[in-house]
């Protein structure tokens, strides 16, 4: 039982930094996750992000990460019961990739708001921190756009809060690596998906256009709340 508990906790912590959202537990005690509902319609972000992209992104891509992550957790539980250490190690990649995909996208949906509501620059404590750490809001946007455009292959660009020095930073992660893989003290405030599935149907191969436009639907209220809660 100790081996099972330790392996499960290590896998979840490694993949998600403790941020998994449980939905249901199996008879063996495996905690799974569920696809989160969106607080807006698929077409609410148009013309910045098309309804077709949002539907495919949420219903197909994110849903697949959820299915595969839950499957990997169930497999992990089974091999831990058997005491198969090599199988536990082999499952870490699937847990990290699919768990990271679920965690990253769950943040991404919260970071977005309908075109009629989003895009206002952050105010309050987060706005002040951005001015202090980057010089201005415009400088932050320029930095994140540059980092996102330069990221080779697929991945994410993040506005992160480092809890230890209480400073903001811009970070990138490859593939579906969650931000916690860059440092245990980093908290994601805002993430932009730069996988092609997030923009290709609309923007083709011009990733910079997608990055320039997505700021029009950013939910800075959410990012500000996370920032203040972490520092409270």
UniProtKB/Swiss-Prot annotation:
GO molecular function: manganese ion binding; superoxide dismutase activity
InterPro entries: Fe/Mn_Superoxide_Dismutase, Mn/Fe_SOD, Mn/Fe_SOD_BS, Mn/Fe_SOD_C, Mn/Fe_SOD_N, Mn/Fe_SOD_N_sf, SOD_C_sf
CC per GO annotation: mitochondrial matrix; mitochondrion
Keywords: Manganese, Metal-binding, Mitochondrion, Oxidoreductase, Transit peptide
GO biological process: response to abscisic acid; response to osmotic stress
Subcellular location(s) per record: Mitochondrion matrix
Cofactor note: Binds 1 Mn(2+) ion per subunit.
Cofactor: Mn(2+)
Residues that coordinate or bind Mn(2+): 57, 105, 193, 197
Domain of life according to the entry: Eukaryota
Protein family according to the UniProt entry: Belongs to the iron/manganese superoxide dismutase family.
Functional description taken from the UniProt entry: Destroys superoxide anion radicals which are normally produced within the cells and which are toxic to biological systems.
PANTHER family assigned: SUPEROXIDE DISMUTASE 2, SUPEROXIDE DISMUTASE [MN], MITOCHONDRIAL
Subunit structure: Homotetramer.
Protein name: Superoxide dismutase [Mn] 3.2, mitochondrial
Gene giving rise to this polypeptide: SODA.1
